[in-house]
Amino acid sequence: MAAKSDGRLKMKKSSDVAFTPLQNSDHSGSVQGLAPGLPSGSGAEDEEAAGGGCCPDGGGCSRCCCCCAGSGSSAGSGGSGGVAGPGGGGAGSAALCLRLGREQRRYSLWDCLWILAAVAVYFADVGTDVWLAVDYYLRGQRWWFGLTLFFVVLGSLSVQVFSFRWFVHDFSTEDSATAAAASSCPQPGADCKTVVGGGSAAGEGEARPSTPQRQASNASKSNIAAANSGSNSSGATRASGKHRSASCSFCIWLLQSLIHIFQLGQIWRYFHTIYLGIRSRQSGENDRWRFYWKMVYEYADVSMLHLLATFLESAPQLVLQLCIIVQTHSLQALQGFTAAASLVSLAWALASYQKALRDSRDDKKPISYMAVIIQFCWHFFTIAARVITFALFASVFQLYFGIFIVLHWCIMTFWIVHCETEFCITKWEEIVFDMVVGIIYIFSWFNVKEGRTRCRLFIYYFVILLENTALSALWYLYKAPQIADAFAIPALCVVFSSFLTGVVFMLMYYAFFHPNGPRFGQSPSCACEDPAAAFPLPPDVATSTLRSISNNRSVVSDRDQKFAERDGCVPVFQVRPTAPSTPSSRPPRIEESVIKIDLFRNRYPAWERHVLDRSLRKAILAFECSPSPPRLQYKDDALIQERLEYETTL
């Protein structure tokens, strides 16, 4: 990826990441350049367009929440490339970046209990599978022992490989970011320009004049830099620090290698998530957000690993054990516990991953625990009906069951490809990803594309209902003679009642528990009537936004006022008089880093967004000098998102 001078991030076929944080300010955004791979002083410098203000003429340009550091015109060399206003370069623009960021959350007891419950589900799933495999071996049933153990080993090895690969990527990225930051801050107290990744320079520009806000920011950064780099005053001290760092790195590598060799990578990540959450509660105000977001990212990683493990181990294990139960016409307690644990693990992984995705995204509202429980029940009952149908059909038609699975997988994969997902860079990598998601679609619904899912949900579950009905009917017609109707009819009732219950929970979730409100009863026309209604803004932000555009729209306001007097009604949009904005009448604004990324975030599926965020998160957390968490700002072509997430020219 290559960076531009305005801080936008372009994607290319490379793993390098470079971007520019846009620092918050009261009157104008200050751009702190990041020059990956360049020494201090030779890369991007602090930029400002000619004129010394937010706009060249010093007025007319309003930055809602003051996070966009672009000028009204690109006059002067090294300008940040802001959006031109309607009146041309001299008139300025009202480029808005309406902040969607939620208020800072804190790690709670419920978060800890949720993670501990996930650990318990994982132990119950894997533990019962291993116990059942040992039981099959002791009873001399080597074929069932081999199949049961095979799925356990397959899921565990796959998870450890992915987990260790992520550790190597994160650890190497963190080391490179730390080394680059140390090289760019040669002296204690210097204004640190964090260097992230590798790539081209972010741009060059003029030195920014000193302002009171910037002086306060530099003072706070200098204090933190001095506290972090106070031991770098002599060459001997730096050499000993390097030696200690190498020893520490070796110990970490050895520990992580042993953890993953003993198949404990997922458990380690769960407890590391709890540790980061506790640290976030015990840390000060400046470090609390950093540990909290590290915890959120770690939980997203381990949730994705759990999702991978369930569809490689729990799902085939569940079908296998149910087939054995139907073929032997007997149910042992251990077999029942194993099947139940696998089913719970499947539903838990899907619901937990959706929660982790929403928690790790600034542009999404967090999902409540009640909504997660409803999602768990939705997936639990629909997957239960699905696997029971598979077990019944496979007990009679083993060969045709394999043909059906392959055919269903091909159809689902073709459908996913038709949805035009954008997960990978190349076309063939995208097809491989769609094939993997097609395996998930054998058992349950998994959203792979942003946008309205009502039609796709209806099509998917309608197809699943038809398949379950056909497979159950074929089993009932061709079942073994020794299977009486006293067993067959209740089995069919369980299949259809379970599926119906899952659909009811799905409707409950979208009708009452969806984070964005009820999803039913909203037509596309009414959804576009007031696109900003679903995203409430702080009072001071909304007031300053309306006040900033009142001068540019005085003619429209006068015309609306005349129409209002004539019709005897108040205009819909009206600017309220407010107190003059003085330093004493408004609260101090916390400086914030905003990373603008020139990517269409909402075109990416949920899984791909997680991978994309993983490539950025370590670089984001490298801003140790920032008193508030950096915020990602993606480009979007939708009306609502373009008004509320990205720059819009008014």
Curated annotation (Swiss-Prot):
It comes from the Eukaryota. It is found in: Cell membrane. It is a multi-pass membrane protein. Phospholipid scramblase activity is activated upon caspase cleavage to generate the XK-related protein 4, processed form. Does not act prior the onset of apoptosis. Disulfide bonds: none annotated. The chain crosses the membrane at residues 114-134, 144-164, 248-268, 306-326, 331-351, 365-385, 396-418, 428-448, 457-477, 487-507. Keywords: Apoptosis, Cell membrane, Membrane, Phosphoprotein, Transmembrane, Transmembrane helix. The modification Phosphoserine is found at residue 200. Belongs to the XK family. This is XK-related protein 4. It comes from Pan troglodytes (Chimpanzee).
